[in-house]
């Protein structure tokens, strides 16, 4: 195992432990002390609250790193398949640590937090990012996929609004819903044509051939699975926002899976 791979797995471990600490100690103690709403929640809802705090923290850290790499990492942008992947690997390692934490959390509290779509999402990400960590390949495309995390804080915020009892017809909820739909569309849906045009542009190149069949299959299969899920979630978000906008002021729209 070379030094860069060893460092990557150290970051994965540190990331997992850090997010576990945030979930198990920092979040529950903080909100138990300062939030009366949190104290009144059931154990299952408190777990989901803490989980969404972890999710938002991960999204902000990794999303910011992605934007920095996209703007300033010339080596990765110049060679999307074999460019120097160090900072991308660090960002991916943080994400992998978070995914381990989240999968274990889902397994532990499956009856409360049941979400098979999220399990499929996490496994597809693991499948492809394993090659990034171990071989340092496809850094540009790995970073491009991680930008989608920028939509996560808005999704979580909608859940928090629901839990604290904010009416879905209130302006804070409507503005967050609009921002969520727009950001989700921009970072997960609108980029699909551009992303695949760049993918197809690499086909047949020397760099693509050097990858070998394993990374090639992992790259394409995981991308297709993730984009199917993203389109499905975008439909749910758009439908939910439409129902809220069309509902009467005192109406209570039904919840949907995108919640």
Swiss-Prot record:
Membrane as UniProt keyword: yes
Name recorded for this polypeptide: TLC domain-containing protein 4
SMART domains in the cross-refs: TLC (SM00724)
InterPro entries the record matches: TLC-dom, TLCD
Entry membrane topology: Multi-pass membrane protein
TM ranges: 6-26, 53-73, 86-106, 117-133, 172-192, 213-233
Chief subcellular location: membrane
The TLC domain, residue ranges: 44-246
């Amino acid at each position: 195992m070379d030094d860069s791979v060893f460092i990557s797995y150290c970051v994965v471990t540190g990331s997992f432990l850090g997010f576990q600490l945030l979930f198990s100690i920092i979040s529950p103690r903080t909100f138990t002390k300062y939030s009366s709403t949190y104290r009144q929640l059931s154990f299952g809802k408190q777990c989901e609250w803490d989980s969404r705090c972890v999710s938002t923290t991960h999204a902000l850290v990794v999303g910011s790193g992605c934007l920095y790499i996209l703007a300033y990492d010339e080596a990765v942008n110049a060679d999307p398949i074999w460019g120097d992947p160090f900072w991308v690997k660090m960002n991916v390692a943080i994400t992998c640590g978070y995914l381990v934490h989240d999968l274990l959390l889902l397994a532990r509290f499956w009856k409360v937090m049941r979400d098979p779509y999220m399990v499929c999402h996490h496994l597809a990400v693991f499948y492809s990012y394993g090659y990034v960590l171990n071989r340092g390949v496809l850094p540009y495309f790995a970073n491009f996929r991680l930008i989608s995390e920028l939509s996560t804080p808005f999704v979580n915020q909608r859940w928090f609004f629901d839990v604290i009892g904010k009416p879905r017809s209130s302006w804070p909820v409507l503005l967050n819903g609009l921002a969520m739909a727009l950001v989700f569309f921009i970072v997960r849906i609108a980029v699909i044509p551009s992303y695949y045009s760049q993918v197809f542009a690499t086909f047949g190149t020397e760099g693509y051939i050097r990858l070998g069949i394993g990374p090639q299959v992992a790259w394409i299969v995981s991308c297709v699975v993730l984009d199917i899920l993203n389109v499905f979630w975008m439909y749910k978000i758009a439908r939910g926002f439409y129902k809220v906008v069309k509902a009467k002021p005192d109406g209570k729209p039904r919840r949907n899976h995108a919640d």
